[in-house]
Amino acid sequence: MRTVTELRTAIEAAANHTTDESICIRWCALGGWWVWINAEDVADAGSLSEWLEQYAGLEEDELEFINNQDWEVVDDDGGLVGEFCGYSNGWGYFNCDEYIAAREALEDSRMDLEAFKAGLALGIPADKVGEAYRGDYDSDEDFAQQLWEDCGYLSEMPEFAQHYIDWDAVARDLMINDFQEEDGHYFDRNW
């Protein structure tokens, strides 16, 4: 097995920290040493342990040495990866499996990252965010008016009557049961 310094060097050489999808890992086995790693590379490998093997070239005994001791995520660069890093019982973690699924769901949905993250913030599962998404609007009233237009309700009523619609009340009713909003992004509540 290589020395701790040699292990650090191998990991540092593989740590492609060039995107907004990076995580900072601290390894207790390596003396509390930390390094920024591209989370997309970790996801492509399948796990942090597999990344250490595939990207950093660690041998089985070296992997066992590192994996049998604590490690934690101490920071992230935001992006999508930030939604899958957190803290529990004082330790930082990275949920690689959920991050992998979310990357695929984001790509399939063809949504922009901020809208996708808004859906996740509302508690919508990553594989349902694209289906639940209704668009971006400046206000609940704008959303309600566009929804009624899309559903054909406005074309069915005389134009003079449209001026009497209380869009604030319509929006309030829609937002109570059927829809939810995060940072101007609107989603079905019943996904």
Residue positions per predicted region:
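Acidic interaction surfaces
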Residues: 1-191
